[in-house]
Amino acid sequence: MTPAAIRPFAKADLEPSYGVWRRAWAAAVPSLDMDALEPGWRRQLPAEYLPARIVLAAECDRALAGFAIFDSARAWLDQLVVDPARHRAGIGRALMAAIRDIEAGPIEFRVMQANAGAIAFYERLGCVRLRPEASPTTGWPSWRYVWPAGRG
């Protein structure tokens, strides 16, 4: 497996990103109804995230392996998604390093409380759990985290 190349998300990444997103969320939280969630994501990614956020793609072996969505105006990580077939290959770390190159200060984000793998990943990076809160879009119980400046 070759290391991930991090680059700007391209239009050609849109369709493969839906599969990566679906596989990642289904693996992270098996109780989610992906058939119900996917149509909303297919609307949200091109309509909301792509025009207004920094979206980075991780490519391995000429295939999309993951992506990150970052709101630089708020120093907010919206999404970090890695194909479960590529977990533990350094892709999440590479995407986070690319985000850190954009924002040297603190970066905040939410993680679903049910997503134990993501929680462990972020805590290994030195992210700090701040408080519980519900996702404003889904109501899912989540943890608010910060990735302090200087970490990464």
Set out the residue ranges of the language-model regions:
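Conserved N-terminal entry element of GNAT/NAT acetyltransferase domains
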Residues: M1-A12, W143, P148-G152
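Conserved active-site alpha-helix within GNAT-family acetyltransferase domains
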Residues: R93-A94, A114-W143
